[in-house]
Amino acid sequence: MFILNTKKNFFAIIINVKIGEKIMKKLAILGSAKSCVLEDILKYFNGKDVEITCLSDDEHCEFFKKAKELNENTKLLPYEINVEYFSSHDVDLVAVCDYRKVLQKEVFETNKFINIHGSLLPAFRGADEISRAFMAGVKVSGVTVHKLTEDIERDEIIAQYPILIENLTHFDEFEENIYKLEGMLYPIVIDKVLKDEVFDFSDFLTSGGCGGSFGGCEGCH
């Protein structure tokens, strides 16, 4: 209540304000192949004030099948209508998960797009990054979350986390660790971007993100 009291006038103005009213954020998850990270994202946001829609251009892919299996809001989105869809739908963020096509340049004018990549960019940009990093014999690889723009050669990095590759590490073990790390890092970064907050490694560590299971994590801090 706002009260104005003068010698000549007395005004009482009652203003109704809703305090603590939460605004539902809208997240789109776009994929067309594997579902490695999808379940981790959905689990992380379960019970949070985030409306999630899973989008794919392939109804037969693992990603789309897993989304339907988990009873998530799913939509088949043909590649040709990407621009039309994202221009007409109010989405706060589009998280790309193993989408196998190059998005149209016009799409990036409509929403914020981020992507997760299984290497420490700018190293091993492009497809098959996990196997290429391993075959190259690097001793440190990892995961990168970055903004997607029309310039595919420009990586606006949001977050990175390393994995040490020991001499006796087999490829299957390395690949599994990359996928595990993606599943832990990506949901936290998505949450931060939705809140317009800056990602900090302390958020990842306090959430139990790194338990030392990736070989040499203790030496990274």
Model feature map: region roles:
Residues 2-221:
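One-carbon transfer enzymes
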